[in-house]
């Protein structure tokens, strides 16, 4: 985990008011600038006006982090919802996504597949069980969390 991400995550997590929760912090290059994305959510989803209110809370807090982890040339701040197709990075993200349609990219092939899409049937903290459609029948594929390179929820059409 990037130092800026860890510092920001640890610093702002206790300041996120209920019923909201800190979903993820991202620190990435955006054009010629660096962007700090604070992804927040709540049961039932978050509204755009709520992200604006949270931005008003979070922005001044970031200015009080000492020592300052941000580059002297500044950064862009985005406070947003993780969205309908949200990233799954931590064990608690997978636990919260049980029953949802997901996309998983693997470090190495499992069942001759490096990318798997299906319904997340269960997650025990270490292994995902994904129900995939193989031609005309369903089958469950077990995926160790350590084998997951990238994952996200998907909108099923």
From Swiss-Prot:
Keyword annotations = Cytoplasm, Ribosome biogenesis
Cited NCBIfam families: PRK00092.1-2 (NF000928)
Q: Which InterPro entries match?
A: Ribosome_maturation_RimP, RimP_C, RimP_C_sf, RimP_N, RimP_N_sf
Q: Does the keyword Coiled coil apply?
A: no
Provide the GO biological process annotations. Answer: ribosomal small subunit assembly; translation
The entry's protein name is: Ribosome maturation factor RimP
* CC terms in the record's Gene Ontology section: cytosol
What family classification does the UniProt entry report for this protein? Belongs to the RimP family.
Question: Which Pfam families would you find in this protein's record?
Answer: DUF150_C, RimP_N
Q: Which domain of life is it from?
A: Bacteria
What is the phylogenetic placement of the source species in the record?
Answer: Bacteria, Bacillati, Bacillota, Bacilli, Lactobacillales
Instruction: Provide the protein's localization.
Output: Cytoplasm
